[in-house]
Amino acid sequence: MVDLKTKAFDFAKNFAIALDGPAASGKGTIGLILAKKFSLQYFQSSIVYRQLAFDCINQKIDVTDMDAVIALSKALKLDSHLDLEHESIGDMASQIAVISEVRNNLNKYLINLVKTTPRIIMEGRDIGTVVVPEADLKIFITANPQIRAERRYKQLQAKGKKCILDEILRQIILRDKRDKERKAAPLLPASDALIIDTSELSAMEVVEEVTNYIKNKIA
């Protein structure tokens, strides 16, 4: 873990947190709690990729038709009423995310959002390394694949959605491989990120660690 004791925070002014990590590592739960605790607007960057995946499926555009996918990414419009959590959408979003032109187009949307939002926590895969490298605080959340699959399985079951644990684990391992090996912004922590392995930690324990870290910086 990188020692960031030399970096001081002025939390009273504009503040941006970049929260990165692999699929189902607990970023969303942790991000929402931190956003509420520190009065930050929370935004999940994967929504733009899932929206694009949904649009491709809806318009019967195959992920291999790169020109069509890229064109669609230039005119993306978010629909907050859609349920974009289905695993098939997440899997296609992961395939779309390896297209560098798509990432460039969607990153423009994300960068503009950060610039126009004074206090924000943005969650994703490359927020601290690409989208907001100047973020006041960068956090990288990770956990082993089996635990992440079990967490996702419980989340989906709680929402009444049918799912198979082994299939979720298979997709998580596949997404990890895509995320880490893609040429455009591979998944990795920023050099100055606070790295937390949540395999044996609850969401509240992680929030407490981050909270103490922030308090030490603004003390």
Swiss-Prot record:
<dbReference type="GO" id="GO:0005737">
    <property type="term" value="C:cytoplasm"/>
</dbReference>
<dbReference type="Pfam" id="PF02224">
    <property type="entry name" value="Cytidylate_kin"/>
</dbReference>
<keyword id="KW-0547">Nucleotide-binding</keyword>
<feature type="binding site">
    <location>
        <begin position="21"/>
        <end position="29"/>
    </location>
    <ligand>
        <name>ATP</name>
    </ligand>
</feature>
<dbReference type="GO" id="GO:0036430">
    <property type="term" value="F:CMP kinase activity"/>
</dbReference>
<keyword id="KW-0418">Kinase</keyword>
<dbReference type="InterPro" id="IPR027417">
    <property type="entry name" value="P-loop_NTPase"/>
</dbReference>
<dbReference type="InterPro" id="IPR003136">
    <property type="entry name" value="Cytidylate_kin"/>
</dbReference>
<dbReference type="GO" id="GO:0006220">
    <property type="term" value="P:pyrimidine nucleotide metabolic process"/>
</dbReference>
<dbReference type="GO" id="GO:0036431">
    <property type="term" value="F:dCMP kinase activity"/>
</dbReference>
<keyword id="KW-0963">Cytoplasm</keyword>
<dbReference type="GO" id="GO:0005524">
    <property type="term" value="F:ATP binding"/>
</dbReference>
<keyword id="KW-0808">Transferase</keyword>
<keyword id="KW-0067">ATP-binding</keyword>
<protein>
    <recommendedName>
        <fullName>Cytidylate kinase</fullName>
        <ecNumber>2.7.4.25</ecNumber>
    </recommendedName>
</protein>
<dbReference type="InterPro" id="IPR011994">
    <property type="entry name" value="Cytidylate_kinase_dom"/>
</dbReference>
<comment type="similarity">
    <text>Belongs to the cytidylate kinase family. Type 1 subfamily.</text>
</comment>
